[in-house]
Amino acid sequence: MRRFRPLTWLAIGFVKGWRALISPLYGDVCKYQPSCSTYGLRALQVHGVFRATPMIIWRILRCNPWSHGGYDPVPGTPEARQWRELHPETARSKNEPIHDLTDDNPRDHEPALRKSIPGYTDPGSTHTGTPSHTRGEN
């Protein structure tokens, strides 16, 4: 049995009000599927207000002119699990290394490791710009 969660229901009411009153003024402008308001509503229903709020904020921040958009289900839902099973390449964590260095000789990866050091400039590189850590100050 689900318990009554007044903050969650208040947030759900806000999202439903937004969808009824504000969304029609803008039309279908969201780059993501489901729309940001549908995402927020689903996140609140599944996770509650405290866990859903950071998800909703992050989703709204990602919905900008520079994003590519696409299908973005709420984490922890059956839709998200099904999407991960059908598209395992999209389930990779941003912190997960693309290549596992543990099985290889580390000396094979030294140039790649050096390039990951902030301020490192490859001696053979033609890049003459200001290092990013100086923020334009010389």
From Swiss-Prot:
Belongs to the UPF0161 family. Pfam families: YidD (PF01809). GO terms for cellular component: plasma membrane. It is a peripheral membrane protein. InterPro entries: Membr_insert_effic_factor_YidD. PANTHER family: MEMBRANE PROTEIN INSERTION EFFICIENCY FACTOR-RELATED (PTHR33383:SF1). The lineage of its organism: Bacteria, Bacillati, Actinomycetota, Actinomycetes, Propionibacteriales. Residues 81-113 have a biased composition (Basic and acidic residues). The keyword Membrane applies. Residues 71-138 are annotated as: Disordered. This is Putative membrane protein insertion efficiency factor. Residues 123-138 have a biased composition (Polar residues). It is found in: Cell membrane.
